[in-house]
Amino acid sequence: DDKRRQI
């Protein structure tokens, strides 16, 4: 889960 990097 990478909330900083939403693609």
From Swiss-Prot:
Secreted keyword on record: yes
Keywords in alphabetical order: Cytolysis, Dermonecrotic toxin, Hemolysis, Lipid degradation, Lipid metabolism, Lyase, Magnesium, Metal-binding, Secreted, Toxin
Main location (coarse class): secreted
Entry's EC annotation: 4.6.1.-
GO biological process: killing of cells of another organism; lipid catabolic process
Catalytic activity, as annotated: an N-(acyl)-sphingosylphosphocholine = an N-(acyl)-sphingosyl-1,3-cyclic phosphate + choline; an N-(acyl)-sphingosylphosphoethanolamine = an N-(acyl)-sphingosyl-1,3-cyclic phosphate + ethanolamine; a 1-acyl-sn-glycero-3-phosphocholine = a 1-acyl-sn-glycero-2,3-cyclic phosphate + choline; a 1-acyl-sn-glycero-3-phosphoethanolamine = a 1-acyl-sn-glycero-2,3-cyclic phosphate + ethanolamine
GO CC term, one of those recorded: extracellular region
Keyword flag Lyase: yes
Protein family membership: Belongs to the arthropod phospholipase D family.
Name of this protein: Dermonecrotic toxin LgSicTox-LOXN6
Species for this entry: Loxosceles gaucho (Spider)
